């Protein structure tokens, strides 16, 4: 068994408290892009800061186990000139 299976997922304590307190009533602001999405967060809208503004993310069951940073891009892509 790999070491990563033994490690528990990182979730900000402040974020977990907000999720339990608001319970799908408000958009939750967070700066913690490294936090892992856990089943308690399903159905909530969490706005993740990308360095410029907060990007709202509606958490679904397919997102469990991923990090919030995966869903808020920090760089804008300008297409290559043809």
UniProtKB/Swiss-Prot annotation:
Name the UniProt key words of this record, in alphabetical order. Chloroplast, Plastid, Ribonucleoprotein, Ribosomal protein, RNA-binding, rRNA-binding
Q: Cellular component per GO?
A: chloroplast; small ribosomal subunit
Show the InterPro entries listed in the entry: Ribosomal_uS19, Ribosomal_uS19_bac-type, Ribosomal_uS19_CS, Ribosomal_uS19_SF
Q: What does this protein do?
A: Protein S19 forms a complex with S13 that binds strongly to the 16S ribosomal RNA.
Show the SUPFAM superfamilies listed in the entry.
Answer: Ribosomal protein S19
The answer to whether UniProt assigns keyword Plastid to this entry is yes
Q: Which PROSITE patterns match?
A: RIBOSOMAL_S19
Tell me where in or outside the cell this protein is found.
Plastid, Chloroplast
Q: What is this protein called?
A: Small ribosomal subunit protein uS19c
Q: Which GO terms describe its molecular function?
A: rRNA binding; structural constituent of ribosome
Which Gene Ontology BP terms does the record give?
Answer: ribosomal small subunit assembly; translation
Tell me the domain of life.
Eukaryota
The entry's family comment says: Belongs to the universal ribosomal protein uS19 family.
